[in-house]
Amino acid sequence: MFELAVKYIFSRKLQSLLMLIGVAFGCGGYIVFTSIQTGFQNFLKERLIENNGHITIRSREDYITPDSLAGVFFEGKRIYWITEPSGKRSHDYLQSAWYWQKLLEKLPYVVASTRRIEATTTCSRASFSRSISLRGVDPVNEPKVTNIAEDIIEGKLQMLSSGNNMVIAGVELLKFLGAKVNDTINIINPDGHVYPVKVVGIYSSGDRRNDESLVLGSITTVQNILESPGKITKIVVKTIDANKAAVFAQKLSQYSYDKVESWDQANVNFLSMTKQQSLIRQITMFTFILVVSFGIYNVLNMMVHQKQ
């Protein structure tokens, strides 16, 4: 049967050539479409991982419900609430940061970890002001976990250690404030206290949202601004395999009551979108194969009828 099909294909060279060109264009289009889609997905995943690490450890947030208070009042008794309790229990800062730091150094699946302190504050210069995301980082350990240092287009991350009032600001934020490197800007903490800081670098990630709001400082600098000495809000971890981050996060969650979350757990909606895109790609491939197969069958069928 195969020999017969080959014979008929080569007997009508022009038709076979046109069929081959059609198949080639179809295959090429599918390959380009798949490459663009897959490349875009991988790029977004890399950006998520590069900026936020594989695993994040932060203070746990618990919602208050009637079940969560079972046994607190009148243990063993059934309680009927006139107004059901609600709300949320949480800590602004990680209570066991140093414990985590020592533990992570001993685990074989942890490559590196770094501490952070983050808060939403306000930045101003002259009559201009804007809400910002203030992030205190460790200039030594941060590059081991994320690629944030590669997004600094002027200055270096290590310059944050040269003083207690040095910051690196997003390029769009500096444009809005009309500031540049070596200028002084003001950061207003949640209590309304103003702290002047010196811009020693410019950050540009290509993400306009970050570039308009992110301000980096050393951990000590940000602790001073927030008036929270020794406080840490999160620990970011890099593991030996980003694809197994959820498994490693599950293991880490057994060591403490703190919230341990992998990058894929924190971006469920994004991963759901990529799965839908992959499904669409598979359907497209199946449809393409079906159309090509039917086209080849029609060509061969026409050749057989012409021979008759």
List the model feature ranges, each with a label.
Residues 61, 189-281, 288:
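Mechanotransmission and gating elements of multispan inner-membrane complexes involved in transport
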Residues 37-131:
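Hydrophobic, regular-secondary-structure patches
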Residues 67-68, 88-95, 124-131, 143-148, ...:
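Solvent-exposed, non-transmembrane alpha-helical starts
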Residues 52-55, 108-111, 177, 230, ...:
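Structural motif
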Residues 116-119, 128-138, 153-220:
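Hydrophobic secondary-structure segments that place a key small or acidic residue at a functional site
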Residues 2-10:
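A short amphipathic helical element positioned immediately N-terminal to and/or at the very start
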Residues 13-40, 275-308:
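Hydrophobic alpha-helical transmembrane segments of multi-pass inner-membrane transport and secretion
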